[in-house]
């Protein structure tokens, strides 16, 4: 039986740690020391690392973790320093006895990857709870295609993104779809969690499909909001582009 732990680092990042009582898999280790303390406190051996993209808050701990463990498998995009098992999407990674499908999800970065082994989806900065990542390298068309691919996963998929942005994302989502009752209910639930010092993650794909505006680009309310903020047509990529630009200055 595998347990999942969101390990907080920086102001709003999580290192995701999947583990049994002996071994652990960690995703996007932006810092080494908190993960080392977690492993030592539970007597866990680090079996592998998964990296979604090259940004430092996801990779800063790689050098220290690998230096202490020569030969440790580090999976991720080839341009990430420290990756020794380069991936591009379409592969399968086996760790802790589970097979993870590697998904190419460009948008936030061009070589962004996600890892899926039911019920877990480790999606980095592509899909957030009630949001999506900024388009630093990719195009709206790429991000729309990537999010559509993730949205097609089963509803009980656990969405393990890497930032605690949920409340701010929900505030924006309410501006996009003020009449969405599911959004109002979710905001109440997540505010209560944060008030108790609890993470809002993981989310579920069913919840994201009901409340995440970037997965709802075909909904009339989202299209209308996008048109009001500069969309020139009703295609998914144009709607996403308009609401993502709006969010960048919200």
Where are these regions (language model features)?
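Conserved beta-strand hairpin/beta-sheet module of binuclear metal-dependent hydrolase folds
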Residues: 1-42, 113-128
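Active-site HxH/HxHxD metal-binding segment of metal-dependent hydrolases
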Residues: 10-11, 24, 31-103, 189
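Core dinuclear metal-dependent hydrolase active-site scaffold
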Residues: 17-19, 92-116, 121, 152
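Divalent metal-coordination and catalytic microenvironments
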Residues: 18, 28, 53, 105-108, ...
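Active-site metal-binding loops of divalent metal-dependent hydrolases
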Residues: 29-31, 54, 79, 108-109, ...
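A short acidic, helix-capping loop that chelates divalent metal ions and anchors anionic groups
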Residues: 83, 130-136, 169
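Active-site-adjacent loop/tail segments of enzyme domains
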Residues: 131-157
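Accessory terminal helices/loops
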Residues: 148-157, 167-250
């Amino acid at each position: 039986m595998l347990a999942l732990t969101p390990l907080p680092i920086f102001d709003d990042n999580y290192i995701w740690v999947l583990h049994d009582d002996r071994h652990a898999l960690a995703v996007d280790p932006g810092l080494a020391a908190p993960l080392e303390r977690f492993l030592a406190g539970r007597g866990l051996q680090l079996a592998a690392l998964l990296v979604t993209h090259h940004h430092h808050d996801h990779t800063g701990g790689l050098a220290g973790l690998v230096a202490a463990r020569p030969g440790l498998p580090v999976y991720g995009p080839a341009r990430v320093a420290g990756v020794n098992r380069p991936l591009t999407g379409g592969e399968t990674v086996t760790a802790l006895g589970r097979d993870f499908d590697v998904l190419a999800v460009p948008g936030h970065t061009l070589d962004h990857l996600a890892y899926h082994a039911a019920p877990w989806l480790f999606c980095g900065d592509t899909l957030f709870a009630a949001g999506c990542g900024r388009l630093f390298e990719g195009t709206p068309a790429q991000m729309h295609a990537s999010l559509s691919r993730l949205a097609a996963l089963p509803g009980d998929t656990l969405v393990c993104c890497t930032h605690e942005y949920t409340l701010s994302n929900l505030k924006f989502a309410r501006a996009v779809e003020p009449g969405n009752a599911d959004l109002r209910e979710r905001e109440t639930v997540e505010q209560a969690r944060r008030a108790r010092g609890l993470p809002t993650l993981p989310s579920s794909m069913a919840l994201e499909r009901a409340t995440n505006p970037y997965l709802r680009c075909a909904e009339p309310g989202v299209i209308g909001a996008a048109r009001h903020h500069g969309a020139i047509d009703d295609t998914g990529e144009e709607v996403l582009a308009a609401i993502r630009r709006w969010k960048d200055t919200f």
